[in-house]
Regions:
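Alpha-helical transmembrane segments and immediately membrane-proximal extracytoplasmic
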Residues: 1-204
Length: 204
């Protein structure tokens, strides 16, 4: 029964990773299009070209807004939220996991500021949000420490796979960077979550 719970949680993490990738990507694009005023006609325009077409005043205003949201948002997060726990830290204490609401707020801040022009990368946000959802689900299922560690690592890779469409690279990322082991169970779990997340993102 315990193994069934684990593999159910891993498959669910793959689905969640794909959905998180879709939602966060669409949110980022919506913010980009709205902030810089392009793409309303449905025609594809790259972010770089869209920003270049915007007036200097609009670009300046968006960047000022970005700075205000980033500074104010992360100040509020630190003042009112629980301490942030990164994925690497969560893997060391998997039963402690990631604080759900704090992580979600942190992820949304990342996506909003990236959409407005912040140089932050967009790959951390889906990894963190997928891992936070997976931890919440794993805790409800009563997974033990080793199972939770595997789930958090695989969920993190699933978020990466969904955003960049790289299931095999994400599998290697989980095994090498997150877990540091190549057991049969770890390989199967990493591959399962990465492939499911990529498939869901492609369908979406």
């Amino acid at each position: 029964m315990g193994r069934r719970k684990l593999w159910f949680a891993l498959a669910a993490a793959g689905v969640i990773g794909g959905l998180v990738g879709i939602v966060l990507t669409e949110l980022m694009h919506f913010i980009q299009h709205t902030a810089y005023g392009y793409g309303a006609d449905g025609a594809y325009i790259s972010f770089r070209e869209g920003v270049a077409r915007a007036s200097e005043g609009r670009r300046l205003g968006v960047l000022i807004l970005c700075g205000m949201l980033a500074g104010g948002g992360w100040w509020l997060l630190k003042a009112l939220g629980k301490p942030l726990i990164g994925i690497k830290a969560a893997l060391k204490q998997p039963l402690q996991g990631l604080p759900f609401l704090t992580t979600v707020f942190h992820v949304l801040l990342q996506i909003i500021t990236v959409g407005l022009g912040s140089p932050l990368g967009r790959e951390v946000a889906p990894r963190e949000m997928t891992a936070a959802f997976a931890f919440a689900g794993g805790r409800r299922l009563g997974l033990d420490e080793d199972e939770m560690r595997l789930l958090i690592a695989c969920a993190s890779g699933a978020g990466l796979a969904a955003v960049y469409n790289v299931p095999l690279a994400s599998t290697l990322f989980i095994l090498e960077a997150m877990l540091g082991v190549w057991t049969q169970q770890a390989v199967a779990a990493a591959l399962l979550t990465s492939v499911i997340a990529t498939a869901v993102a492609r369908i979406g």
